[in-house]
């Protein structure tokens, strides 16, 4: 900062103190204050919106990662063994993951093993699920393995297909809009400085008019009255010129803001409308893809489980399993 800039900053700081203490009359423009208040509200809301939109994308990543973690834990918990429940799934279906449609072909073979355990015969059914994609074929022994693979592929496809349009149509436009605040705030700051200069100059001129002798140098007080009057008139002329100059600068920037701030505020609706529409469509696409894929897996659950769920009997089935577990010797001490 140059010496002139430092001097101006010091003078403006002194003017601010005198304004706060009431020693200088402050210029008030209620129309401008109203428009600046509207502008500050818009600035606060749009910056908050940008932050929340970034957090929304992060939350979707967190959601899909949590789904993968749960699916991975379920896959480890179930292991590779089949049970009767996983063998009763529907045999055909299709999974749509975004742009790819995966066709599911299932081949089942039944292996019956008869074992005599207290004259009881046990029948075990083995199910193999084959998912064919464009280049790769995956074989799964149960629905949990298929669920884990499907969720993982959902994460890879949905988030990858979502990020680019979300950034281009939602995040980037609002970031570009918010970037203008830096320039606008600089103009508002400049207007504030010009107002301080204007108020300080008005106060200086007022003091000269009210107390002309205090603005005459001591050496001139011994001179004749005409010279004192001439000096006063000369100083008054200089102060008036300076006041006109600072007033012109202040009025110019003040009028500019009075015209352009309302326009900027009114343009926000038409500017954000396309991004809002895109945001809704991206949400719809993301959740529709997730729903479609998970619904295909849900259709593979055995019919009895679905019926029990509809009738509210699923909890009774769980209680029945718990009762059977309690009959085991290893869990007999848990009562």
From Swiss-Prot:
Subcellular localization(s) per the UniProt record: Cytoplasm, Cytoskeleton
Highest taxon of the lineage: Eukaryota
Ranges annotated as biased composition (Acidic residues): 107-118
Coiled-coil spans in chain: 30-56, 222-259
Keywords: Coiled coil, Cytoplasm, Cytoskeleton
SMART domains reported in the protein's UniProt record: BAR (SM00721)
Listed GO biological process terms: actin cortical patch localization; endocytosis; plasma membrane tubulation
GO cellular component: actin cortical patch; actin cytoskeleton; mating projection tip; medial cortex; Rvs161p-Rvs167p complex
Segments for region (Disordered): 105-127
Residue span, BAR domain: 17-310
UniProt xrefs under SUPFAM superfamilies: BAR/IMD domain-like (SSF103657)
Disruption phenotype: Does not display the endocytic, hyphal growth, virulence, or cell wall defects exhibited by disruption in related RVS161 or RVS167.
Entries under Gene3D superfamilies matching the protein: Arfaptin homology (AH) domain/BAR domain (1.20.1270.60)
Function noted in UniProt: Component of a cytoskeletal structure that is required for membrane curvature.
This protein's name: RVS161-like protein RVS162
Organism: Candida albicans (strain SC5314 / ATCC MYA-2876)
């Amino acid at each position: 900062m140059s010496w002139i800039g430092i001097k101006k900053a010091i003078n403006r700081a002194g003017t601010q103190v005198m304004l706060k203490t009431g020693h200088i009359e402050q210029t008030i423009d209620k129309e401008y204050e109203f428009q600046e208040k509207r502008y500050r509200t818009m600035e606060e809301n749009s910056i908050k919106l940008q932050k929340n939109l970034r957090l929304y994308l992060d939350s979707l990543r967190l959601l899909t990662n949590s789904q993968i973690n749960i699916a991975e834990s379920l896959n480890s918990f179930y292991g590779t063994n089949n049970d009767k429940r996983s063998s009763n799934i529907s045999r055909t279906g299709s999974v749509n993951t975004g742009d790819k449609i995966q066709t599911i072909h299932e081949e089942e073979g039944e292996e019956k093993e008869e074992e005599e355990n207290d004259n009881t015969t046990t029948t075990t059914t083995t199910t193999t699920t084959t998912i064919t994609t464009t280049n790769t074929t995956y074989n799964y022994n149960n629905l949990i393995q298929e669920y884990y693979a499907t969720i993982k592929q959902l994460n890879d496809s949905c988030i990858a297909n979502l990020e680019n349009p979300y950034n281009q149509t939602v995040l980037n436009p609002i970031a570009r809009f918010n970037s203008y605040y830096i320039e606008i705030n600089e103009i508002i700051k400049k207007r504030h400085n010009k107002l301080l200069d204007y108020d300080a100059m008005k106060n200086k001129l007022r003091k000269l008019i009210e107390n002309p002798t205090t603005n005459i140098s001591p050496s001139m007080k011994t001179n004749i009255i005409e010279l004192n009057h001439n000096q006063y008139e000369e100083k008054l002329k200089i102060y008036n010129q300076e006041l006109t100059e600072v007033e012109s600068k202040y009025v110019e920037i003040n009028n500019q803001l009075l015209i352009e701030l309302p326009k900027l505020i009114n343009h926000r609706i038409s500017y954000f409308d396309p991004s809002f529409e895109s945001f809704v469509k991206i949400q719809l696409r993301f959740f529709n893809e997730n729903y479609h894929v998970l619904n295909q897996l849900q259709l593979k659950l055995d019919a009895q489980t679905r019926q029990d769920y509809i009738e509210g009997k699923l909890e009774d089935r769980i209680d029945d399993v718990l009762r059977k577990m309690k009959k085991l010797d290893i869990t007999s001490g848990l009562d």
